[in-house]
C-alpha cells in the first residue's frame, strides 16, 4: 500500500527524515545480531537515498565506516551534513550538472575526509555504456581503502 501510494504521490521518496529513521532502525537491528554487530557498515544511497544515508550516519556516527552517494541529493540532508563523522564519497555524472553543483555545495559543508568523483559523460542514472562499471570500480576502491584504514595493523 505504501509503495503504491508513493508511486502516485512521491511523498515517501522525498521524506528524508522517514528514510533516515528506517536506516537507523536497520543499523540498530544489525547491531543487535551476533553475526553482524561487529561488521563495518557502509551506507550507500542514490538520489534521495543519499540524503537519508547522510542523516543516518550523522545520527549513529560510531557505527558507520563510510557513506557513498551515487548521483545523490546530499543537499536534502540539511543540517545533518556538518554532523557526519564518516568519510564520504560523492559519485556524480559529468553531465548531471545540477546534481554536481548540489554535491559540490554539500561537500563544502562536511568536516570529514571526502571525495567528489565525477564520471565523465554520465547522466543522472549512469545509463551510458561503461559508466555504471566506473561507478562500481570507484566505490569498490573507496571502500577497500576505508576497510584497510579501519583494520588493526596486525590484520593487514
Where is each model-derived feature located?
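Short beta-strand/loop motif that positions the catalytic acidic residue
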Residues: 84, 90-92
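Gly/Ala-rich beta-loop-alpha elbow adjacent to hydrolase catalytic centers
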Residues: 44-53
Amino acid at each position: 500500500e505504501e509503495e503504491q501510494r508513493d508511486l502516485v504521490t512521491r511523498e515517501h521518496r522525498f521524506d528524508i527524515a522517514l528514510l533516515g529513521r528506517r536506516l537507523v532502525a536497520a543499523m540498530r537491528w544489525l547491531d543487535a545480531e551476533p553475526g553482524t554487530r561487529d561488521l563495518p557498515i557502509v551506507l550507500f544511497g542514490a538520489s534521495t537515498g543519499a540524503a537519508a544515508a547522510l542523516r543516518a550516519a550523522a545520527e549513529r556516527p560510531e557505527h558507520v565506516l563510510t557513506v557513498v552517494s551515487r548521483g545523490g541529493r546530499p543537499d536534502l540532508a540539511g543540517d545533518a551534513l556538518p554532523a557526519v563523522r564518516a568519510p564520504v564519497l560523492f559519485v556524480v555524472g559529468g553531465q548531471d550538472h545540477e546534481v554536481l553543483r548540489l554535491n559540490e555545495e554539500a561537500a563544502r559543508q562536511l568536516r570529514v575526509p571526502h571525495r567528489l568523483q565525477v564520471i565523465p559523460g554520465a547522466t543522472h542514472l549512469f545509463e551510458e555504456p561503461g559508466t555504471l562499471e566506473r561507478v562500481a570500480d570507484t566505490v569498490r576502491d573507496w571502500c577497500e581503502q576505508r576497510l584497510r584504514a579501519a583494520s588493526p595493523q596486525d590484520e593487514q
